[in-house]
């Protein structure tokens, strides 16, 4: 019963859409109706600028960290793993916003930073290298999320499966980006969208 409460609580924490709130407060827009239509940091960056994107990334990361930490601290390891998955599901498919959310990268990073700081930093570092080299945020994110389960494997099979679920969700949410990467139509970082 307690694990179910943890899952539900984490899911609704995930529903707290930083990009939606930032869009409303700074420009009175629904970020999902601008740019790529995604409720995430990259779309906020292209639509509203660096400061708004930084706030979005920070907020989405913190909710991932908070969900995993609280479940781990007050319930246990297994509950924390479930909370980590639930908060990302809540971010990606928020019932409070008609199931139209983000892609879960910042929230997954937040979860991973508490679950395994070393695995998180290693994955982020690889993502940053890819971003610097190719200038595609999507490719950077996909690469970091693909490698994350393997960095988590040293903590045991349970952590590997946990990482694999997070990875699959992230890649699934990037399926349109993957199509554009293949056709050469994906936007590189720095290209701004007008509101």
Curated annotation (Swiss-Prot):
Enzyme type, top EC level: transferase
Q: Example GO biological process term? A: phospholipid biosynthetic process
From the Swiss-Prot or TrEMBL record, state where the protein is found.
Cell membrane
Q: List the Gene Ontology MF annotations in alphabetical order.
A: acyl-phosphate glycerol-3-phosphate acyltransferase activity
Q: Which reaction does it catalyse?
A: an acyl phosphate + sn-glycerol 3-phosphate = a 1-acyl-sn-glycero-3-phosphate + phosphate
Q: Where are the transmembrane segments?
A: 2-22, 79-99, 111-131, 146-166
Per the record, GO CC terms? plasma membrane
Pathway participation: Lipid metabolism; phospholipid metabolism
Q: Does the keyword Lipid metabolism apply?
A: yes
Q: Which UniProt keywords apply?
A: Cell membrane, Lipid biosynthesis, Lipid metabolism, Membrane, Phospholipid biosynthesis, Phospholipid metabolism, Transferase, Transmembrane, Transmembrane helix
Its placement in the membrane is given as: Multi-pass membrane protein
Task: Tell me the InterPro entries matching this sequence.
Answer: G3P_acylTferase_PlsY
Q: What is its EC number?
A: 2.3.1.275
Annotated signal sequence range: none
Q: What does this protein do?
A: Catalyzes the transfer of an acyl group from acyl-phosphate (acyl-PO(4)) to glycerol-3-phosphate (G3P) to form lysophosphatidic acid (LPA). This enzyme utilizes acyl-phosphate as fatty acyl donor, but not acyl-CoA or acyl-ACP.
The family classification in the record reads: Belongs to the PlsY family.
Please describe the quaternary structure of this protein: Probably interacts with PlsX.
- The molecule here is called Glycerol-3-phosphate acyltransferase
Q: Tell me the organism.
A: Alkaliphilus metalliredigens (strain QYMF)
Q: What lineage is on file?
A: Bacteria, Bacillati, Bacillota, Clostridia, Peptostreptococcales
The gene name reads plsY
